[in-house]
Amino acid sequence: LCFSTAKRILENGQIDPEDKNNIGKTAFDIAMEEGARRIGALLSGQDPETDELSALAGGLNVFQALWYKDMAALDAILRSGVELQTICEDEKLHDFKGKSPLACALSWDNAEAAEILLRSGADPDFRDSEERTAFAVWLKKRKQGSEKKEECLHLLRCLMQCGWHPENPADKEGNTSLSLACREAGYELGNWAVRYLVENGADVNAVNLQGQTPAMNLYGGRFWDGNIPCFAVLPRSYPYGGRCCTEEDADILEVLLEAGADINAKDKWGNTLLHYIAGSSQRGAKEAVGLVMDFGKPDVNAVNNEGKTALDIATEKNDESLVKFLLKYD
């Protein structure tokens, strides 16, 4: 009845479908929100009585279907053929702005939609307006909850099966997917991803544009512009110290070390893994350095471009236990 009424009104030209109500919504906006897909199709200029796919899609685009979590509409849109290597430009879909359809599905924990998009041709390596892959966006969800583990691992497998190249840059800093996962290792999704990627042959020594390895990113690696203030009293940043590490990070470090992580690699500013560990936090730093020692002989006297050793950084942070530990090898 509602559809027939809407059709007659449109045919009679009694209203302008682009008119807005007092809160700025068009008839199509309301049809989208209320799930009136046949009316939505009609308002978008389609004929839902003769076109089955348009009746299901309701005039929605792929981002709108994801926003309203309408799987029937999404399926119809995909069956009708749609470009999936694109980004959302709709200001109304604020949480999707600038993201790809796959990234939108992953960031909203819509595993079913993510898999359908992948099977329909979404490119896992496509980068959005901020040069992030869908995986990079997904990591920022910082998922917790062990009940999600199998779902996450299933999606990681789907990404691989659908052409994902995790060794490719996943962001504008040139980080691989493993490096980004290491940055998010304080959360279960990051931990699961690190283990999965290493088990599937990820390069544990791949460096980003700053020369940071996955292990360095695990221990607080972050973007740094290299700026050092002229006066020591002025605030400054460092390439390390990007996250507060804990004793639990040693488990992930061990995974990287067992896979052959280079313990003497240096970033573009001369910092080694020991510099990063010393700059990360006081929790677990001593244990992490001890673990590194178990896998080789790192150069504890290595100095960065500012002339600092890991011991110097530990001293600046008043990490007494790490200072005492490093002095044994000085």
What are these regions (language model features)?
Residues 1-2, 30-36, 64-69, 104-110, ...:
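Ankyrin repeat A-helix N-terminal signature
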Residues 1-2, 8-12, 22-23, 29-33, ...:
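Intrinsically disordered, low-complexity repeat tracts
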Residues 7-16, 42-49, 75-84, 88, ...:
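Ankyrin repeat domain, specifically the short helix-to-loop turn at the C-terminus of the second helix
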Residues 14, 21-25, 168, 175, ...:
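Asparagine/serine/threonine-enriched low-complexity, disordered tracts
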Residues 21, 55, 88, 95, ...:
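Ankyrin repeat boundary/linker residues
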Residues 30-68, 162, 259, 315-330:
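Ankyrin-repeat-protein effector appendages
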Residues 41-80, 96-99, 107, 115, ...:
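Intrinsically disordered, low-complexity regulatory segments in ankyrin-centric signaling systems
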